[in-house]
């Protein structure tokens, strides 16, 4: 599975212009785009939304490499999910900066909590 960020210069009023989709099918990744829409309604800037989309794109690529899907179910989340993502990022070469790793984890945490408020 391959994922990418698309940017729509004209989007419906309550939809973020930055969207994460599966590359081959164009199918949107629902949990990510719902979070981006929520942040868009909060009036975050387009550049900020695009950064969020790319950070979540990185997470969903990692998630799909393990779970073979971009969809996240609450039952798949564990207390160690974000720690495992942290370890994955720390093992990359070249290693991302500490602030990049922290930004990616923070946005993934917020998006997952938005979708699954009762998850571990």
How would you name each of these model-derived features?
Residues 1-61, 65:
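Basic/aromatic DNA-contact patch characteristic of tyrosine site-specific recombinases
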Residues 33-47, 56-120:
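N-terminal core-binding DNA-recognition domain of tyrosine recombinases/integrases
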């Amino acid at each position: 599975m391959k994922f990418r960020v698309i940017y729509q210069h004209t989007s419906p009023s309550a939809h973020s212009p930055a969207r994460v989709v599966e590359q081959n099918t164009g199918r949107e990744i629902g949990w990510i785009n719902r979070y981006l829409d929520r942040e868009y309604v909060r009036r975050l800037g387009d550049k900020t939304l695009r950064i969020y989309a790319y950070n979540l794109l990185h997470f969903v690529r990692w998630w799909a490499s393990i779970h073979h899907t971009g969809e996240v179910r609450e039952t798949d989340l564990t207390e160690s999910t974000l720690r495992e993502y942290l370890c994955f990022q720390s093992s990359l070469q070249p290693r991302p900066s500490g602030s990049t790793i922290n930004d990616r984890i923070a946005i993934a945490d917020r998006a997952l909590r938005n979708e699954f408020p009762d998850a571990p």
